[in-house]
Amino acid sequence: MLGLLKKTPSADETPTPGPFGRFYLQELINRGGMADIWLATDERQKPYALRRMHQRLRFNLLARRRFVRGAEILSRITDHDGIVGYVEHGKIQGQLYLLMDYVEASNLKELYSRQDQVLLENVAQILIDMAVALEHMHENGYMHLDFKPENVLVTRNANVRLVDFDLAQQIPDKPLKPSKKNPGTPAYMAPEQLLGEPFTHHVDIFSYGVAAYELLTNEKPFPGDTPREILNRQLDRSTFTNPRQHNPDIPPGMEKVILRCLERDAGRRYPFVGLMVREIQAALYA
């Protein structure tokens, strides 16, 4: 199934199957803060993943702008095996929607929480493929800004699909000033984001490092219950544990990659994802 962070429906917004324009919503796959994901079919019974924005956000201009921008960015980068397939986006009955290829998959968080065999048997290739998907996005001029295990889908054949581009933006010529609300998931955000400082595409590289650390150790590199606690751990590395201390089976070269991704100073991380990909490949398939 398409995997996104699950949320409990509110009493006044319980989703039910039924017609939606020329589509029929067959089954609710998952709920996010901004939209539902449905298994939908058209008049030919072809299955799709249909992402429909919540009705309660119909007058929220910022949310609508993010939804549309994310759909437009997906339409520009979809020609890659590591990116979920785009079909169309628009508005039906006043509700914004995004139509994507239907993928039988689980997200990475679900896979490692249950120690799924697909992950255990293919972890090296998954690490490479999710980096390659991020590289494709950057090469097309966009940064994801919400890169985390929940936004990486993996099929039963271990094919990777990067999803959820609501926070994505163009890579700026100079560091971008954060918005006041500073959206994102704190556990995967770089120090400059949590500090409210200008940032660049290097924040995605940091996020990849957090995800890879977590994937290989089943621990977070900077644990904390609040953004402040997480930031304090990022800034004060006295209690930081290197990945191989958790899992000695991690190749030394891969640990080196992760540690470079997690550098406090953005300038000490990889300058671009392509270099990171090559070092990951060398580390895992040497």
Where are these regions (language model features)?
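Activation segment signature within eukaryotic-like protein kinase domains
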Residues: 126-127
